């Protein structure tokens, strides 16, 4: 559920909307299962070996934050269905929005730093700065982690200040929950404070992510062209590996675009609250969140091997 931009006051009675709500909850369960599996697999490896690869530390941080985010989304969705006329900035929804804002920002930053790591480590650019980064980047992973937590905490506090100001104004003026949209303080805070802050804080990690994705896809594309010149065609294992990597990167980039655009449209109030279009937007957001770990499971050799071991152990269990 997108942060705090929701004005309640009408129940979900549209049959299509109810179906979308059910789909949204199922997508959350899929995302919880996928992210939970990846977090558990990498967490067990971390405990057994006492260490993880730098990129896996970022990956497990990303998956853990997404895992928690899906639970918050489910909790907020259920609360909205049970109390459709509740004031959108009441303490319960502020508490859920606080968690959602932090976890959403954390997933965006962890995704951006992970794309930086993969870009620097995998891309084959020969610029001196790029080569220098290859040797230094692994040492910066702790800084990436703490910067993600710090930036997410800072932006969450900014969101909380805006949400709490609206709630205090509501208490002072004895407004009705359904009339909050007509209040000038609410309108001013949403348009000139919350929305700009969201755009800035969401766009920064998204821009980093896409710059790195473009560089990485460009590098892999050039490498694949060279491989095609020295091999007999697409059936060669090396070429197929490049094709699979490119397809995985493109699919992840498309999912990230869909996620980001849906967040922006929802924050801008394009989707009417609790209407069919609103739930369409929410479903798109969490469809991306649900598909992403599945792609990762089948594109990562180590995670795929863990999944196969789990399947084989279940088959042997009487």
Curated annotation (Swiss-Prot):
Glycan attachment positions: 163, 179
Topology in the lipid bilayer: Multi-pass membrane protein
TM region positions: 8-28, 41-61, 89-109, 129-149, 184-204, 235-255, 265-285
Extracellular side: 1-7, 62-88, 150-183, 256-264
Pfam families, per the entry: TAS2R
Cellular-component GO terms for this entry: membrane; plasma membrane
Cross-referenced SUPFAM superfamilies: Family A G protein-coupled receptor-like
Side of membrane Cytoplasmic, spans: 29-40, 110-128, 205-234, 286-318
Domain of life: Eukaryota
UniProt key word Magnesium: no
Keywords for this protein: G-protein coupled receptor, Glycoprotein, Membrane, Receptor, Sensory transduction, Taste, Transducer, Transmembrane, Transmembrane helix
MF-aspect GO terms: bitter taste receptor activity; G protein-coupled receptor activity
Subcellular location: Membrane
Role: Receptor that may play a role in the perception of bitterness and is gustducin-linked. May play a role in sensing the chemical composition of the gastrointestinal content. The activity of this receptor may stimulate alpha gustducin, mediate PLC-beta-2 activation and lead to the gating of TRPM5.
Additional record remark: Most taste cells may be activated by a limited number of bitter compounds; individual taste cells can discriminate among bitter stimuli.
PANTHER family: TASTE RECEPTOR TYPE 2, TASTE RECEPTOR TYPE 2 MEMBER 60
Entry's family note: Belongs to the G-protein coupled receptor T2R family.
Name recorded for this polypeptide: Taste receptor type 2 member 60
Organism lineage: Eukaryota, Metazoa, Chordata, Craniata, Vertebrata
């Amino acid at each position: 559920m997108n942060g705090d931009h929701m004005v309640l006051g009408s129940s979900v009675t549209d049959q299509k909307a109810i179906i979308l709500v059910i789909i949204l909850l199922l997508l959350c369960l899929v995302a919880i299962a996928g992210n939970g599996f990846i977090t558990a697999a990498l967490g067990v490896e971390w405990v057994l070996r006492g260490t993880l690869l730098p990129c896996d530390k970022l990956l497990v941080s990303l998956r853990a934050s997404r895992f928690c985010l899906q639970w918050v989304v489910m909790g907020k969705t259920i609360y909205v269905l049970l109390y459709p006329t509740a004031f959108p900035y009441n303490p319960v929804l502020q508490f859920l929005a606080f968690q959602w804002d932090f976890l959403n920002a954390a997933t965006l930053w962890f995704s951006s730093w992970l794309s930086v790591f993969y870009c620097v480590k995998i891309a084959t650019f020969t610029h001196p700065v790029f080569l220098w980064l290859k040797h230094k980047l692994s040492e910066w992973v702790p800084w990436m982690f703490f910067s993600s937590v710090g930036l997410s905490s800072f932006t969450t506090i900014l969101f909380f200040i805006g949400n709490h100001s609206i709630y205090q104004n509501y208490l002072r003026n004895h407004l009705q929950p359904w009339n909050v949209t007509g209040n000038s303080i609410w309108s001013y805070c949403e348009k000139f404070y919350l929305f700009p802050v969201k755009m800035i804080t969401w766009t920064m990690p998204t821009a980093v992510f896409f710059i790195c994705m473009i560089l990485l896809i460009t590098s892999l594309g050039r490498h694949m062209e060279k491989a095609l010149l020295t091999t007999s065609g697409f059936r060669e294992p090396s070429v197929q590996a490049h094709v699979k990597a490119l397809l995985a990167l493109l699919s992840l980039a498309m999912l990230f675009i869909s996620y980001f655009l849906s967040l922006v449209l929802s924050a801008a109030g394009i989707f009417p609250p609790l209407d069919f279009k609103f739930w369409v937007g929410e479903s798109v957001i969490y469809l991306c969140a649900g598909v992403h770990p599945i792609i990762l499971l089948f594109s990562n050799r180590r995670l795929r091997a863990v999944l196969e071991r789990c399947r084989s152990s279940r088959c042997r269990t009487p």
